[in-house]
Amino acid sequence: MINKIENWDKVEANYGEGKRLTAGGYICKILAVVKEKSKAGKEMLVVNFDIAEGDFKDYYMERYKNATRDNNNPVEPKWKGKYYLLLEGDGYEGRLKAFITSVEESNSNYSWDWNEDSLKEKLFGAIFREEEYIYNGEVRTNCKVWQTRSVKKIRDNDFELPRKKELPEEEKAKINAPFVDTFQPITEEDLPF
């Protein structure tokens, strides 16, 4: 017989699913910034970050560690805390300026010098929203950075929570479409021999 756990009634059940990030405002810390090309061939900055404070502190590091520990997964785990900023195309300047301004306002004595390496270890505020996607034939939800703000605005709760980004109904209908059986029996006359 095993020993009874003293605070058994207060223990929270852990089903191995881990904490799920929810929509809201978070204080984030930049771990690295890399200049890359998008799938469309456009220049972009990839901001690798993690959550720096609160209930979800180190959220992406924990996910990465857990994925690394999974010996049954042959795929190399990917860092999930990423924010993409295009450096060309329509309207990219405003989004880049919003991000840089958020970083400058969140880090005293920091001034952007056009060197992406200078962003490392800096804080910024991020507003995450829920986004739907399809995985293995089912609609799932994930949270991603929608916009950036200063750390102060996040701490003061001075932002609006965005609506969930839902998939178009026609995309959802494709995965819920009934299976149509197009099987036609083959007779001996249909055989090539």
Language-model-detected regions and their locations in the chain:
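Short beta-rich binding modules
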Residues: 1-193
